[in-house]
């Protein structure tokens, strides 16, 4: 058999297809991160994590690669610039980052700084996001778009921000909202910059398809759009409308759905121009997807188009319809948050070593002394001895039947616990023996293709699924998971990944594989005393902000890293993860009050001689140390 290579590992984890040329495997068998596609510079993830641990930064660690963030902004801007040139498009393109995708200050700040030369803007949907965007725009002159529902306070804040020099556009979502805007504008004497969101009949596809279509949550129907135009005319505010916006959903997997929305949305733009609305911008919303599984398909974790194809279709469709309708082409805006930030962060954590010295039954003695076994267990031994490639199906089915029979006999009291344990042990041996034969078969019989799941072992990783990758639990989103080391060795254990929460839902059983979605993740058998790390990739969009504190596992340690040609990498920022006292504070516990209550109770016990002073003091020290410690597992 040929020696396992890093190319084999790249295939089974599909790195070349989902990695966007930002991730690779080096000759040491470690995962590397590149600042931009095809860059000759790289950071060895295993070396980086080892260095961070030497700095007392413990896993789980969220690694944020800021150069990738800059590169994604540049890539999106570049493909639109090329599409504009190729199609002789007479207007401009501008990207807006929807900060709901990842509101972390350092992330938004980096996007604001990187995006200056690309005239990037920020999109907000709430008062806290508005305030955050205003703070980031200060000194940077970043334009801001306001979507979502707005109350009077929100509208007043925007209008006075406009008065003092901020470039902010209010996007009207509902007719009653427009009435409020008109009222506040008249009362303050400040004319707003307005956009209108239209509700398209066209829909996206996948888990967010309801963002578009006639039943969408946001936007004006065509009849309401006509009414809005009339209201603006009556209040002499029609000239304040400069933008038309539509959005048909996040992570649109099929390019034809995007084309349909572009055609309908641009037709509405053209008709509004003919009605005398001097629109200057067409905001096509989000939807630009990320190929999480690398299949380049219309599956919900993938996309069947490239970044270049997306940009070309946007520019071509808008120009074609505007030329046909005889109206000026608009400046185009997109809100591609997911595609901007998904790739830039990686969560790395340790797998808890499952190597134990647990004594298992002496298999050889079971085989040689089978006459002492119960009839059910003896039948399993006979199957093990006689397995060959000609009887695989029958042997597999008989084994499953006998293991079920052993459970029934145990429940009825006819099989003791030792005999049931022997049945389980022999069953696992049979499955492994069958697997060793199946692996060599071409093709694998249909009935045996799924049986390998019975070999799947649960590997426990030091993280909270609900905190770090909640979409995996909530919507069955696929994220690439790869060991960051030993990729020059064949991974010989089929696994599922369980977190350390006390919840059965805290387990991942669907993974990115060589041929798309797979139900088991190949990992290595962990060596004694080995620190074995796995990385969760493409988690930069939504995961950090949607994460919750199940079991009070808090934010992880986070490290901002930039590439450095001299030292390979530079640590810009370290954000310490939540300590136990911080997680408790979220749910209204005060650490000092906890210590006070426990101390008072211990003093009573000391006075009654139930515990010694030394025991009381030692316990308080341990409790205080626990309050100051990371919420995740240590040694």
From Swiss-Prot:
Keywords: Decarboxylase, Lyase, Magnesium, Metal-binding, Polyamine biosynthesis, Pyridoxal phosphate, Spermidine biosynthesis. Its EC number is 4.1.1.19. Its cofactor is Mg(2+); pyridoxal 5'-phosphate. It is an enzyme of class 4 (lyase). Substrate binds at residues 282-292. GO terms for biological process: arginine catabolic process; putrescine biosynthetic process from arginine; spermidine biosynthetic process. It catalyses: L-arginine + H(+) = agmatine + CO2. One of its GO terms (molecular function) is arginine decarboxylase activity. It holds the Pfam family Arg_decarb_HB. The modification N6-(pyridoxal phosphate)lysine is found at residue 100. Pathway: Amine and polyamine biosynthesis; agmatine biosynthesis; agmatine from L-arginine: step 1/1. Belongs to the Orn/Lys/Arg decarboxylase class-II family. SpeA subfamily. Catalyzes the biosynthesis of agmatine from arginine. PANTHER family: ARGININE DECARBOXYLASE, BIOSYNTHETIC ARGININE DECARBOXYLASE. This is Biosynthetic arginine decarboxylase. It comes from Geobacter sp. (strain M21).
